[in-house]
Amino acid sequence: MKGLGSTIVRSLPNGARLVCADNTGAKELEIIAVKNYTGTVRRLPAGGVGHMVFVSVKKGTPEMRKQVLPAIIIRQKKEYKRADGTRVKFEDNAAVIVTPEGTPKGSEIKGPVSKEAAERWPGVSRLAKIIH
């Protein structure tokens, strides 16, 4: 896992619903925890593009539903600024289910993957068709 080059806005708090962008059988995910988050009193833990989160599968195949799994956020609606000054935002909030080490469980990723997530997680960048 590599550090992030740009300032990512942590716009997805606990309880946020994400689209599952891989072919593991999950359709909709809900964030229940953000890994390595150190916050302040009464503030909800939140994550952004490239962060690892723990999710609960809300919609999907019967085998996948109600499971708690690690995932990596690959897209977010809230715009964030890159080091070169450009601002990036996506159409939806999406994540990919991974193993605890960061290797994707699925064999394909649907839609674009942010450059920040691809740089930080090599396993995700291997499966990405579009890196934006």
Swiss-Prot record:
Keywords: Ribonucleoprotein, Ribosomal protein, RNA-binding, rRNA-binding. GO terms for cellular component: cytosolic large ribosomal subunit. One of its GO terms (biological process) is translation. InterPro entries: Ribosomal_uL14, Ribosomal_uL14_arc, Ribosomal_uL14_CS, Ribosomal_uL14_sf. It comes from the Archaea. Disulfide bonds: none annotated. One of its GO terms (molecular function) is large ribosomal subunit rRNA binding. PROSITE patterns: RIBOSOMAL_L14. Part of the 50S ribosomal subunit. Forms a cluster with proteins L3 and L24e, part of which may contact the 16S rRNA in 2 intersubunit bridges. Belongs to the universal ribosomal protein uL14 family. Binds to 23S rRNA. Forms part of two intersubunit bridges in the 70S ribosome. This is Large ribosomal subunit protein uL14. It comes from Methanococcus maripaludis (strain C7 / ATCC BAA-1331).
